[in-house]
Amino acid sequence: VIFKAVRENAPYPEHGVTHQRDWSAIAPRQVRLDQLVTTRATLDLRDLLDEDSTFFGDLFAHVVSWRGDLYLETGLHRALRAALQGRTTIHGRVLELDETGHPTAAPPPPPRP
């Protein structure tokens, strides 16, 4: 088993952390693949090539921690590549949500130009 579970969507409420600059405020850490629940069952090239995708921007997967589970929000391609290479972990930015789905420690706002 590569992942803990495979889902078609995210079960948690919209958290509002959507832009690359917001995610970059969260320090990356190692996450075990077998602890991740995916939020999509397929790898769609349109999503992969989107401007806010981790394919072009962030080097780290985006993971949401909610109600005791870790959900792989973006970076499915990175997780699959790691599994194919025989690795059991990836580095990801983990956004912690409270019970209601709000970030427990909201990332600071991006600097103004």
Residue ranges and their predicted role:
Residues 16-71, 83:
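Short alpha-helix boundary/capping and kink motifs at helix termini
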Residues 1, 6, 34-38, 88, ...:
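Generic signature of intrinsically disordered, low-complexity, basic-rich segments
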Residues 113:
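Feature 3881 marks metal-assisted phosphotransfer/nuclease machinery
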Residues 1-24:
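N-terminal leader/domain-start detector
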Residues 56-110:
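A short, basic-hydrophobic beta/loop patch
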